[in-house]
Amino acid sequence: MAVVATMTVPGNAATAGALARTGALIEAKGIVKIYSTVSGEPVLALDQVDMAVADGEFVCLVGPSGCGKSTLMRLFAGLDRADAGAFSLAGAAIDGPSAEVGVVFQQATLLPWLTVWQNVTLPLRVGGHSIGDREAPVRELIRIAALQGFENKYPYELSGGMQQRVAIVRALSRDPKLLLMDEPFGALDALTREKMNAELQRIWLASRKTVVLITHSIDEAIFLGDRVVVMSPRPGRIVRELKVELPRPRVAAETFGHPEHVKLAREIRALLEG
């Protein structure tokens, strides 16, 4: 820990400039994140994390609890700052929250006093944008998410899965370049989660947004991802990146028994078990 306490933080601006030349939509280079305990002892959460995601790619991030997955997502979202290294989105340094990044959390976090339509258009109103300019695309997202006819319903009138679909549409309402998802289906039962995986795949195939999804489910990661990134226990590092060669659209009943799925699941499990 003494090394962490005396670590020299490199200049983020210079690093970000190098990232902009790589061609990835979003990239992290040399990311270090340090937290302090109540007693002031430094805790190394992320250590020299390098990660790149191409435009339109769906990447799933898996790792043991406490390895820094959510911390990395917060850094990608501009909700926190790294102690070393840099992030780049579409060639520009990430130095704070941006309309170019949509975020979906484990809980839908819908405002209960607003209707579905009011919830999904909230980012537009808060950001000072004209709803009229985005109304047609947002209504198309509602159609893709199978929420047509529910625009005037309130969150309490929706199932958990429907609430998460509303949260996804809300995150996409400002047409972000990047969608970050932190265990969005972790609180759902197994069958609903499987259905939501299929729904998310359908929405993604229609929108082709760049997605980074955090999950503890190996099956979910393989079903949804073009690539699965495996992290180590804390301090979080990238252990391996595995390409998923399964054809799309994927159907759970067919995919889970596919030899490629079985092989990848076995390999990911071995990496997680150390």
Where are the language model's segments positioned?
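Helix-to-loop junction immediately C-terminal to a conserved catalytic motif
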Residues: 77
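Signature (C-motif/LSGGQ) region and adjacent switch/coupling loops
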Residues: 42, 97, 117, 143, ...
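Hydrophobic anchor residue at the start of the ABC signature
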Residues: 168
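Conserved signature/switch motifs of ABC ATPase nucleotide-binding domains
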Residues: 153-156, 174
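Short coil-to-helix segment of the ABC ATPase nucleotide-binding domain corresponding to the Q-loop/switch region
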Residues: 114-122
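The feature captures the beta-strand-to-loop junction immediately N-terminal to the Walker
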Residues: 62-64
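Conserved ABC ATPase "signature" region
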Residues: 125, 132-150, 202
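Conserved ABC transporter NBD signature motif
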Residues: 85-97
